[in-house]
Amino acid sequence: MNYGKLGELGSVSRLTLGGGGIGQVWGPTSHEEAAATLRAAVEGGIDLIDTAPMYLNCEAIFGETFEGALPAHVRVTSKCDLGTPPVGQAASLLEASVLRSLATMRLERFDLLFLHSSIAPEGYAYAHGDSRRDKFSTRWDLYVDEVVPALEGLKSKGLIRAWGITGIGVPQTVLQALDHATRPQAVQVIANLMDSAGGIRRFAEPAAPRTILAKAKENGVPVLGIRAVQAGALTAELDRDLSPNHPDRKDFERAQGYRDLCRTWGEDPADIAHRYALSMDGVDTLILGVKNRDELARTLKAEAAGRLDPAQIAAIDQLGLRT
């Protein structure tokens, strides 16, 4: 395992274990296998685990697996999908979310807490799901006036060590947050060869993840790359049922040429996709969506193989898959 630096957390493994796979967001796995995967990740050199209350039973499995005795070198992140609550409630909602998650996971503090809801301009109308925007989107004025002070307050209380944002919101507002006087201490950014957010993209504008990556690097904000295999679209086969019109299904079909290219190299598409993401400038650690030990072992092997060479990256980029 190679290691890099992630801001206030210091040295971290280049791979981060994501809670989505553990919580069965990315297809089925057993409770026992999820727990075994958690332990195997730590044994394999991964020292950062990314969790969230919305990842189904991820937090409960984590708590049962480590029983309050997490290895000292392992760091843990969590998230709050705050949305846009009534004025004056953001701080209490964020703290309540953190306290619930800490209790479930049998921890005293999170190393990183991410605002998981999309950040959007005032009055912004989403192309998809706009009627529910206050559930999944945090408006800019609320972010500045309440959310940032509340997150800084959680640091002062010792409940979190640092805070960040999930940079999947409207790109102009994510960039604005990265330029704000009180910047996030980390940002999660789409990092895949298609530049695609798939089914989690609700806005009409281009996703612009590489622009966000560049801005984060320019401003010294550490980056956790996400969706390296684009929710399965960059794997040999999808591991869950999706409708023909689902964005992730459409990406899978659009990536057939990529799978053909990997076949000529004698490589697994998921392995190459992970190595591509790890080769992207500005990605400090890559969050995995693995759900069992077999998938974990393959990604550990892919990380050990190192970055892709420039010719491979060029061949992939020439497929024209970027959104």
Task: Tell me what each language-model feature is.
Residues 118-323:
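Beta/alpha (TIM)-barrel catalytic core signal, keyed to glycine-rich beta->alpha loops juxtaposed to Asp/Glu
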Residues 26-29, 51-60, 83-92, 120-121, ...:
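Acidic-and-aromatic substrate-binding clefts and catalytic sites of carbohydrate-active enzymes
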Residues 42, 93-114, 153, 157, ...:
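CE4/NodB-like, metal-dependent polysaccharide N-deacetylase domain
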Residues 28-41, 89-104, 169-178, 273:
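Short, acidic/polar
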Residues 6, 17, 34, 49, ...:
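Conserved, mostly hydrophobic/aromatic
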Residues 7-8, 63-75, 103-107, 155, ...:
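Acidic (Asp/Glu)-rich catalytic clusters
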Residues 1-75, 95:
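N-terminal binding-site loop/beta-alpha segment at the start of enzyme catalytic domains
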Residues 7-25, 77-84, 114-117, 121-127:
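N-terminal small/glycine-rich loop or linker at the start of catalytic domains
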